[in-house]
Amino acid sequence: MTRPSARHVLPEFTERTSAGTRTSDPYSKLLQERIVFLGTPVDETSANDVTAQLMYLEHQAPDRDIELYVNSPGGSFTAMTAIYDTMRYVACDVATTCLGQAGPSAAVLLAAGTPGKRAALPGARVVLHQPALTEPVRGQAGDLAVHAAELVRVRARLEEILVRHTGRTPGQVAADLERDTVLDARQAREYGLVDRIVPGRRTPPASSGAR
């Protein structure tokens, strides 16, 4: 597994075990606690890392929850669908929590958590917008038509996923994707992207019925 990039040196912990000593980093410690952290843009590398961890944790204990923490600006729709499909494939419930931000692709993963187990910290920010091509398309008319058709397919798939997990109507989701829709934690809860706002581990969470 490739470590997420960091601007600082990650600390390492040395623990004494029955077999001797073991050195690990924060991400390894989180994995031991069944926590997967998505803290980078959603791309092929991060998708492979997250899906591998989800499948490993399912194999380790298929009857225990997995916690997916999200702080990501979003990214590739294709990479996002790899994580999304794996979340739905594994037998474990996947609880999702947004801390910081969940950009468009990451917002889908946040919403795709097990119903009742989707949360946001008070300062979280969630963004929705329609998919776009990552770079200009060049070529003959037939090539442009292929890319246009794929963009329409991706847009339809994104709308379908958001409708499924938020309870919004197709018309509402389609309208909200026409422009950048920026939501704070309370608005994300009202939209149906999360179920509750969690101020802290010792503080009772604010559920969807709270104002």
Swiss-Prot record:
Positions annotated as active site in the UniProt record: 129
Similarity annotation: Belongs to the peptidase S14 family.
SUPFAM superfamilies named in the record: ClpP/crotonase (SSF52096)
UniProt-recorded name of the protein: Putative ATP-dependent Clp protease proteolytic subunit-like
Gene Ontology biological process terms, A to Z: protein quality control for misfolded or incompletely synthesized proteins
Residue numbers spanned by region Disordered: 1-24
Gene Ontology MF annotations: ATP-dependent peptidase activity; ATPase binding; serine-type endopeptidase activity
Coiled-coil residue windows: none
Entry GO CC: cytoplasm; endopeptidase Clp complex
Purpose of the protein: Has lost one of the conserved residue (Ser) proposed to be part of the active site. Therefore it could be inactive.
